[in-house]
């Protein structure tokens, strides 16, 4: 049997072991209200009194009208019935959930179901992490490398012991050695297989010591201070008992730790420098009574002083009374008389039973009324913050001894797996900046908590038959709370943010990953959890921007000294007092900041609120909360507004000094790299905006200012002032778009064209019960300088009304008058055009075109004029009056428009032709995409199509050849046909999303499925940090500025190359036929511009713009030329393979080139390996964190 066949059989067997269960619906109309993970199967779906409740083999999901609860089953500690009809769920992370039912029988039925679901597993394979991994294996059967990247931790975790020994600089020649006495866990089942001990301690002595220490947990070194050589060691309590036993080998080992530390300090100190002073010695602080003159400054004197070991600090986490009481159970503490040169300190930390009671009191307090009058006193009575204070003080004592006193420290409690890892892990975090990075923190957790046997299965309650409640205690959660306190005090010292810690708390209990299963490494090895489950570090990886602290500075304090008083500590509200997740993103429809997803390197993760027309608003409001940003897209809402839709809506012009990141809402203009402004209505669907603007022209006024600057006056038609005010309030998104159309173009020509093109237009509209509202908003021409004036011209909508005969209504525009001293007519395009839909089922991949030839507008001197010109900032705008030809434009289609339907089959959009403004300087093109609207408001959508995102297009200018001689001239109008190629960008995004989101299979949208914007890829609720979100917006704005500068440099380079080619052509005397194209290309700054080829008005009508990169294949860098990774500069060797990026061709290591995405430019339409930089530009979606602020930032306090 070949390997492939055997692998496929293994996948089949794995899925047979974890089969999907039959779904039981209490109501046939109910659907699963969430998207299931791989291996997840929903068992029950029913209705509570005011919610929909669903239970799967992984989670409990309760969808209320205005919020939702999404909890993994293993996070629930207990379920009980209260008040007959109410279920009371207590969670292990301090949350309490209440669910009300209509009948007592229904309440009891769900009580029984939940108690069966949360019962500790009979065997470990019953935990969801095994089913999740098995089903993932089937999905990735054809992509083994990608599967490994997704489910495995990094090399820094798998090779942690060797890397840490080298990084901390242990002297393995003279002072220390690595003992393999615990190989295959034959000495101690809860210890790692490799231990660091003094070099002269033999394995036989270690065996003797193990008989004297609790659970055979002998003293082992875990950390070395890289500057002074002081170390931290850990162990279990000595088994002194009432008989006062002692062990000579144990006493020798403890003293040897101090001697080896002194020896290691001497050897490392001699390597550093020859300039020795008292502070260079490990006992420099004790030299104050020595007259340090030249006679003692020689090498022999320094060496003799360094040999003397420092006094070792034995830190016992217990109180003295508790340590003495443990002698009755065979334990005890070190006797100072038996351990010379040692100091014993008792910290008085509470045991797990006291911590559990304190946590239960805290949980009870957090479930009370939101604002109890005695909150602070009640919080103090729980003693939770007091326990955190004692823990921080204990760790700080270790830090002070190692860093300042340069003394070695030995830490233990009773057994050495609860309070001991808390102290040593916290001390290492304070001492070493490496552990404050994401990778270092992962290594810290793996070594101090997992390798040294913290009993996660017993403490978290997900072990096999772990019914003993006395063994449960949130020890690891308490430690994470201390880390959170450090984050608050040192916001710039941690690479990871609070969301990282919140995720770690959730997955400590969720059992989605196998990292925290079992009680020790021996059990995990026997159960093969590493091979059969995914690692939590694959989610909390260093490359995930959602968990990076943007305030982090690697140059921050090397050693942290926090304030440990209770008054300086704060309750961790994100974990203990979380806000309920909104049901849908429409709850937070007012975003106070512009969308940060404007940079390709910063993919968006949230959704914009949607705007729709409803047949029955009452029904719509029953399903979700009302939209705050809803506009009058339904005729039944505002008849007065419908009667005056012809009025021109103008948005306020942004001042030249406006902060690009200070827009108060998405409806306000947002600066983009080219200087253009984009104001996006909060309710426009993503696919609609994308198709509207994807082929939009790269517009800029190409007219240099004449000696006397001309102004543009804009005036709305005669209209009721109250109505005008109302229309401005209801549609503040009205935008500026420069359009050209000859007013003399007859109705006959347009109607003739309409007869041919309108059936195609109407055929693209599918019949739906709810209407669409498509809004093109606020695309303003980027100004050349301060003196430019942006002229808002028109917005247009398409509304599909579900009443009898379907109609699409286009509002009648107001003709604009543009004057250079005298007014020139520049009529704005279409009006109201009713049409019938051809059928309910229209293929979604069809792209419809509506084209027409548009004549240019001639100015007084015979040159072509534009509606958008540069104007003096001191001039007032002139008048833009309605034209008499306005009424003749009724029932005309949008000239030069392109109709698209997205791949989701429900979006109709009207798209401006890329060259609607002829031969104006084409500067920065924009593509916006918002959330694609489907038939159902609450349908599932790809997260990659979720947030407004702008994709800059190649930069350049399109100027007429005559512009060099006549500064104020504009060039000809191109036909819409020249730019009518259909872009399928939204379809490509959807295709990429299907390939990239591997954590969940596809699901059919249903009326009960909410939007997934508040659920992360791990099925948990998304945690949002407003401060980090704002920082990402600032970072995004900075990246945009950098990209703009890069493009300007490229533009100048192209201009220089163009001038060089032109000058060389004249110099060589080549005046062949090509000379006719020189005037058209002299001023052209874009090599790809359509107007470079001819001066004929419509000669490019049959040409299509082709990017130069589209015709070239990426040239790969040869393997033999790449010795280091192009991104991280790490050297390649046997275990670090070389990987080519299929997009840029450079060579990377596996961690820097671990993403897969289609690369259409290289004819690679299946997911192919690319580097992280190319992945960010090719893939508009990424997991996990919402880059757009959904709520205004508000200060909170506990």
Curated annotation (Swiss-Prot):
Keywords: Coiled coil, Cytoplasm, Hydrolase, Lipid metabolism, Membrane, Metal-binding, Phosphoprotein, Zinc, Zinc-finger. Its EC number is 3.1.3.95. Zn(2+) 2 binds at residues 1141, 1144, 1171, 1174. GO terms for cellular component: cytoplasm; cytosol; membrane. Residues 716-732 have a biased composition (Basic and acidic residues). Residues 265-285, 590-612, 650-669, 716-735, 855-891, 933-974, 993-1019 are annotated as: Disordered. Zn(2+) 1 binds at residues 1125, 1128, 1149, 1152. Residues 265-280, 999-1010 have a biased composition (Polar residues). Residues 155-576 form the Myotubularin phosphatase domain. InterPro entries: MTMR3_PH-GRAM, MTMR3_PTP, Myotubularin, Myotubularin-like_Pase_dom, Prot-tyrosine_phosphatase-like, Tyr_Pase_AS, Tyr_Pase_cat, Znf_FYVE. The active site is at 413 (phosphocysteine intermediate). The modification Phosphothreonine is found at residue 731. It holds the Pfam family Myotub-related. It catalyses: a 1,2-diacyl-sn-glycero-3-phospho-(1D-myo-inositol-3,5-bisphosphate) + H2O = a 1,2-diacyl-sn-glycero-3-phospho-(1D-myo-inositol-5-phosphate) + phosphate; a 1,2-diacyl-sn-glycero-3-phospho-(1D-myo-inositol-3-phosphate) + H2O = a 1,2-diacyl-sn-glycero-3-phospho-(1D-myo-inositol) + phosphate; 1,2-dihexadecanoyl-sn-glycero-3-phospho-(1D-myo-inositol-3-phosphate) + H2O = 1,2-dihexadecanoyl-sn-glycero-3-phospho-(1D-myo-inositol) + phosphate; 1,2-dioctanoyl-sn-glycero-3-phospho-(1-D-myo-inositol-3-phosphate) + H2O = 1,2-dioctanoyl-sn-glycero-3-phospho-(1D-myo-inositol) + phosphate. One of its GO terms (biological process) is macroautophagy. Decreases the levels of phosphatidylinositol 3-phosphate, a phospholipid found in cell membranes where it acts as key regulator of both cell signaling and intracellular membrane traffic. Could also have a molecular sequestering/adapter activity and regulate biological processes independently of its phosphatase activity. The coiled coil domain mediates the interaction between MTMR3 and MTMR4. It is essential to bring together CEP55 and PLK1 during mitotic abscission. This is Phosphatidylinositol-3,5-bisphosphate 3-phosphatase MTMR3. The lineage of its organism: Eukaryota, Metazoa, Chordata, Craniata, Vertebrata. The gene is MTMR3.
């Amino acid at each position: 049997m070949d390997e492939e066949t055997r692998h496929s059989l293994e996948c089949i067997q794995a899925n047979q072991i974890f089969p999907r269960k039959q779904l039981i619906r209490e109501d046939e109309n109910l659907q699963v209200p969430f998207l299931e993970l791989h291996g997840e199967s929903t068992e029950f779906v029913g209705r509570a009194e005011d919610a929909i409740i669903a239970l799967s083999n992984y989670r409990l999901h309760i969808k209320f009208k205005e919020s939702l609860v999404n909890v993994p089953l293993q996070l629930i500690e207990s379920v009980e019935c209260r008040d007959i009809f109410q279920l009371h769920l207590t969670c292990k992370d301090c949350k309490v959930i209440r669910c009300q039912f209509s009948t007592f029988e229904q309440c009891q039925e769900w009580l029984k179901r939940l108690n069966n679901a949360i019962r500790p597993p009979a065997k470990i394979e019953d935990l969801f992490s095994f089913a999740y991994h098995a089903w993932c294996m089937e999905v990735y059967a054809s992509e083994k490398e990608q599967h490994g990247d997704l489910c495995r931790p990094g090399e820094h975790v798998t090779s942690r012991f060797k890397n840490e020994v080298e990084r901390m600089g242990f002297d393995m020649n003279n002072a220390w050695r690595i003992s393999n006495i615990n190989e295959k866990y034959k000495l101690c089942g809860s210890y790692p297989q490799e231990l660091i001990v003094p070099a002269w301690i033999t394995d036989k002595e270690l065996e003797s010591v193990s008989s004297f220490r609790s659970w055979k947990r002998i003293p082992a070194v875990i950390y070395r201070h890289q500057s002074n050589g002081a170390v931290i060691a850990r162990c279990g309590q000595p088994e002194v008992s009432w008989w006062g036993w002692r062990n000579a080998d144990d006493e020798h080992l403890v003293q040897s730790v101090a001697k080896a530390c002194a020896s290691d300090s001497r050897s490392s100190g001699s390597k550093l420098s020859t300039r020795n002073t008292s502070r260079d010695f490990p006992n420099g602080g004790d030299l104050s009574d020595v007259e340090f003159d030249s006679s003692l400054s020689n090498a022999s004197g320094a060496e003799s002083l360094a040999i003397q070991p420092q006094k070792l600090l034995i830190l016992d986490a217990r109180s003295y009374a508790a340590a003495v009481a443990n002698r009755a159970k065979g334990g005890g503490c070190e006797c100072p008389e038996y351990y010379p040169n040692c100091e014993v300190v008792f910290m008085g930390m509470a045991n797990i039973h006291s911590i559990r009671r304190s946590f239960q009191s805290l949980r009870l307090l957090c479930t009370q009324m939101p604002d109890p009058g005695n909150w602070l006193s009640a919080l103090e009575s729980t003693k939770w913050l007091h326990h955190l204070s004692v823990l921080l003080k204990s760790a700080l004592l270790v830090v002070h001894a190692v860093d300042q006193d340069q003394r070695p420290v030995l830490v233990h409690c009773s057994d050495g797996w609860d309070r001991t890892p808390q102290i040593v892990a916290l001390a290492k975090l304070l001492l070493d900046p490496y552990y404050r990075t994401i990778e270092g923190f992962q290594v810290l957790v793996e070594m101090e908590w997992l390798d040294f046997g913290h009993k996660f299965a017993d403490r978290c309650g997900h072990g096999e038959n772990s019914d003993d409640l006395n063994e449960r205690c949130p020890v690891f959660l308490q430690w994470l709370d201390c880390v959170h306190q450090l984050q608050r005090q040192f916001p710039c010292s941690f690479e990871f943010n609070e969301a990282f810690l919140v995720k770690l708390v959730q997955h400590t209990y969720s059992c989605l990953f196998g990292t925290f299963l079992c009680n020790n490494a021996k059990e995990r090895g026997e159960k093969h959890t590493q091979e059969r489950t995914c690692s939590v570090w694959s989610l909390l990886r260093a490359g995930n921007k959602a968990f990076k602290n943007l305030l982090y500075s690697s140059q921050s304090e090397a050693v942290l000294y926090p304030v440990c008083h209770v008054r300086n500590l704060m309750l961790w509200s994100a974990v203990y007092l979380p806000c309920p997740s909104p049901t849908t993103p429409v709850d937070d429809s007012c975003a106070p900041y512009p969308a940060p997803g404007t940079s390709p390197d910063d993919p968006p993760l949230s959704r914009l609120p949607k705007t729709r027309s409803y047949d029955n608003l009452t029904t719509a409001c029953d399903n979700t909360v009302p939209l705050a940003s809803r506009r009058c897209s339904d005729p039944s809402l505002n008849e007065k507004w419908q009667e005056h839709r012809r009025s021109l809506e103008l948005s306020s012009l942004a001042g030249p000094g406006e902060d690009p990141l200070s827009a108060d809402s998405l409806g306000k203009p947002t600066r983009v790299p080219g200087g253009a402004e984009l104001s996006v209505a909060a309710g426009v669907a993503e696919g609609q905006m994308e198709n509207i603007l994807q082929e939009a022209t790269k517009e800029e006024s190409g007219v240099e200012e004449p000696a006397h600057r001309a102004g543009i006056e804009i005036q709305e038609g005669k209209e009721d002032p109250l109505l005008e005010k109302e229309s401005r309030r209801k549609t503040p998104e009205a935008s500026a778009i420069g359009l050209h159309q000859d007013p003399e173009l007859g109705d006959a020509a347009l109607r003739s064209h309409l007869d041919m093109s309108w059936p195609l237009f109407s055929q693209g509209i599918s019949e739906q019960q709810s209407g669409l509202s498509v809004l093109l908003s606020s695309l303003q021409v980027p100004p050349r300088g301060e003196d430019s004036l942006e002229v808002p011209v028109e917005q247009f909508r398409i509304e599909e009304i579900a009443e009898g005969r379907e109609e699409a209504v286009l509002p009648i525009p107001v003709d604009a008058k543009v004057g250079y001293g005298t007014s020139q007519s520049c009529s704005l395009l279409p009006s109201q055009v009713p049409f019938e839909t051809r059928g309910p089922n229209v293929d979604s991949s069809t792209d419809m075109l509506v084209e027409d030839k548009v004549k240019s507008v001639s100015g007084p001197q015979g040159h072509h004029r534009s509606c958008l010109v540069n104007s003096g900032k001191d001039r007032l705008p002139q008048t833009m009056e309605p034209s008499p030809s306005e009424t003749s434009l009724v029932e005309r289609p949008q000239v030069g428009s392109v109709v698209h339907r997205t791949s989701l089959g429900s979006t109709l959009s009207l798209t401006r032709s890329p060259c609607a403004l002829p031969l104006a300087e084409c500067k920065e093109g924009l593509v916006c995409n918002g959330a694609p609207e489907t038939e159902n408001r609450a349908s599932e959508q790809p997260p990659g199509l979720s947030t407004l995102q702008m994709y800059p297009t190649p930069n350049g200018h399109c100027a007429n050849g005559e512009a060099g001689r006549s500064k104020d001239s504009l060039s000809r109008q191109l036909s819409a046909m020249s730019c009518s190629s259909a872009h399928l960008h939204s379809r490509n995004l959807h295709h990429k999303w299907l390939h990239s989101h591997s954590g969940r299979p596809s699901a059919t949208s249903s009326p009960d499925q909410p939007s997934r914007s508040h659920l992360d890829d791990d099925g948990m609720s998304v945690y949002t940090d407003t401060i980090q979100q704002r920082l990402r917006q600032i970072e995004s704005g900075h990246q945009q500025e950098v990209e703009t500068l890069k493009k300007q440099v490229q533009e100048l380079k192209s201009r220089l190359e163009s001038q060089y080619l032109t000058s060389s052509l004249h110099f060589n005397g080549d005046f062949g036929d090509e000379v006719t194209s020189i005037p058209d290309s002299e001023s052209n700054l874009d090599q790809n511009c359509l107007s470079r080829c001819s001066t004929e008005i419509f000669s490019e009508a049959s040409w299509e713009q082709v990017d130069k990169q589209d015709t070239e294949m990426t040239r790969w860098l040869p393997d033999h030329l790449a010795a280091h990774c192009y991104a991280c500069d790490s050297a390649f060797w046997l275990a670090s393979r070389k990987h080519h990026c299929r997009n840029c061709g450079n060579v990377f290591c596996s961690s820097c080139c671990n993403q897969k995405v289609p690369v259409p430019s290289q004819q690679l339409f299946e997911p192919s390996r690319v580097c992280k930089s190319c992945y960010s530009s090719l893939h508009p979606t990424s997991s996990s964190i919402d880059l757009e602020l959904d709520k205004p930032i508000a200060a909170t306090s506990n």
